[in-house]
């Protein structure tokens, strides 16, 4: 049996990790994209060594890897645990000032001294958290539970395994940079992470077990115009901004993130930048089904061709499509033990597993593309990438319990 988890230690770890400014930079060409990620990587290296792990290394790309050999000769499996160092560039992660709400009583929570607040009127899940200890923001930054809650949970689980000498299988640990911008995982040293399967600890609500994700691509559409003084523009000016606005109208209005859920894909206009002479539109293309995904990419190509033919532009619009990641299910389905073990571990600690698709991606999607099954486990966090982000300390404790239970590798 696992003795009572020291919530104070778990909380202190988390609060320490979120003090590192590790926000990734979206247009970076090299990893890590921010200095703080390397600083956190070095801190974790130090702590992993103190915990007695072996082969603890930090690469020049800020990828942390470590190994803890099994302490029971009958437990021969090797399981990996993965979390990421960076926070989202969509909301400031600098000078995070967490606030701890003990025994949340329900109702609205004021964030800091400003006008920001979170309310169960908008976030119905808060009703489930009454009586729990919540860590929230001060309303000026994100919290960083994505994914520093996962890091704290992995480190706490390792600490308990070592202190209590709990029988466990071989364990590989990795902390990766720049997950939020899809960059750092490309520098992942697969040769130092050989395992039977792995788990990212990067999910949300307690019970979440995810092993299907979007196929993802990014499309960039460029428009070229011709500027001239507006007083003499008739018959001469070509406004790239106007062209871009017209092109945007060809997309299905209901196939967008704010109108879809479950396994329904979408197009998402993520960025619109430029001026009269040149504009670039950036679209996210997402779908769970591989055939539908291909059709979505073909749709954009066809619309670009039609637009060019219709307008007869001297300099036609340009299209660039880059695949980002693929649905991990094609790999995970061949390693059903990875799902069965997580299911069993959750049930063993009194948690009902909630199998759900990820409407996004994780480092596990990339690892799956390399042949390594890597489902995603909950962290106890909510409202990621926003000033309304929060995490439940009891939810984090649940994650630690599940990690330890999985690493016992019972009945495998």
From Swiss-Prot:
Which InterPro entries does this one have? Answer: ArgE/DapE_CS, Bact_exopeptidase_dim_dom, Peptidase_M20, Peptidase_M20_dimer, Peptidase_M20B
- Residues that bind Zn(2+) 2: 146, 180, 385
Cellular localisation: Cytoplasm
Which biological process annotations from GO are given for this protein? peptide catabolic process; proteolysis
Q: Which PROSITE patterns match?
A: ARGE_DAPE_CPG2_1, ARGE_DAPE_CPG2_2
Which reactions is this enzyme annotated as catalysing? Release of the N-terminal residue from a tripeptide
The record's comment on protein family reads: Belongs to the peptidase M20B family.
Q: Which cofactor does it need?
A: Zn(2+)
Q: Where does Zn(2+) 1 bind?
A: 84, 146, 202
Tell me the cofactor note: Binds 2 Zn(2+) ions per subunit.
Per UniProt, the keywords (alphabetical) are: Aminopeptidase, Cytoplasm, Hydrolase, Metal-binding, Metalloprotease, Protease, Zinc
Q: What residues sit in the active site?
A: 86, 179 (proton acceptor)
* HAMAP family with a match to the protein in the record: Aminopeptidase_M20
Q: What is the originating organism of this protein?
A: Haemophilus influenzae (strain PittGG)
Its recorded name reads Peptidase T
- Is the keyword Glycosyltransferase assigned to this protein? no
Which spans of this chain does the record mark as coiled coil? none
Q: What is its main location?
A: cytoplasm
Q: What is its EC number?
A: 3.4.11.4
Q: Per its UniProt record, what Gene3D superfamilies does this chain match?
A: 3.30.70.360, Zn peptidases (3.40.630.10)
- State if Zinc is listed as a keyword: yes
Q: What is this organism's lineage?
A: Bacteria, Pseudomonadati, Pseudomonadota, Gammaproteobacteria, Pasteurellales
Enzymatic class: hydrolase
This entry's Gene Ontology molecular function terms read:
metallopeptidase activity; tripeptide aminopeptidase activity; zinc ion binding
Question: Record's Gene Ontology CC terms?
Answer: cytosol
Q: What does this protein do?
A: Cleaves the N-terminal amino acid of tripeptides.
């Amino acid at each position: 049996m696992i003795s009572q988890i020291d919530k104070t230690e778990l909380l202190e770890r988390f609060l320490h990790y979120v003090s590192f400014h590790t926000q990734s930079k979206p247009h970076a060409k090299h990893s890590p994209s921010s200095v703080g990620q390397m600083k956190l990587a070095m801190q974790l290296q130090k702590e992993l060594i103190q915990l007695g792990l072996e082969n603890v290394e930090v690469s020049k790309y800020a990828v942390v890897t470590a190994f803890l050999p099994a302490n029971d000769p009958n437990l021969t499996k090797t399981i990996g645990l993965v979390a990421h160092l960076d926070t989202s560039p969509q909301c400031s992660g600098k000078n995070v000032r967490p606030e701890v709400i003990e025994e949340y009583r329900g109702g609205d929570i004021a964030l800091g001294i400003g006008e920001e607040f979170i309310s169960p009127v908008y976030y119905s899940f808060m009703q489930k958290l009454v009586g729990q200890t919540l860590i929230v923001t001060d309303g000026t930054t994100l919290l960083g539970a994505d994914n520093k809650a996962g890091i704290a949970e992995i480190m706490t689980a390792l600490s308990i395994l070592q202190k209590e000498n709990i029988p466990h299988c071989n364990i590989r640990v990795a902390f990766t940079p720049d997950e939020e911008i899809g960059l750092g995982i490309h520098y992942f040293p697969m040769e130092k992470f050989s395992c039977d399967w792995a788990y990212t600890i990067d999910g949300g609500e307690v019970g979440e077990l995810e092993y299907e994700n979007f196929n993802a691509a990014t499309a960039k559409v460029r428009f070229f115009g011709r500027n001239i003084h507006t007083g003499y523009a008739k018959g001469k000016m070509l406004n790239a901004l106007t062209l871009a606005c017209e092109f945007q109208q060809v997309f299905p209005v209901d196939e967008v993130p704010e109108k879809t859920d479950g396994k329904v894909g979408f197009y998402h206009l993520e960025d619109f930048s430029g001026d009269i002479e040149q504009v670039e539109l950036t679209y996210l293309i997402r779908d769970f089904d591989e055939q539908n995904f291909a059709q979505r990419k073909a749709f954009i190509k066809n619309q670009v061709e039609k637009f060019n033919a219709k307008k007869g532009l001297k300099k036609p619009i340009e299209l660039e499509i880059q695949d980002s990641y693929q649905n991990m299910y094609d790999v995970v389905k061949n390693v059903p033990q990875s799902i069965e073990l997580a299911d069993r571990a959750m049930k063993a600690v009194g948690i009902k597993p909630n199998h759900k698709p990820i409407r996004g991606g994780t480092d596990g999607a990339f690892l799956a593309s390399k042949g390594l099954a890597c489902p995603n486990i909950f962290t106890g966090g909510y409202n990621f990438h926003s000033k309304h982000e929060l995490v439940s300390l009891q939810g984090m404790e649940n994650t630690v319990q599940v990690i330890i239970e999985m690493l016992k590798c019972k009945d495998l």
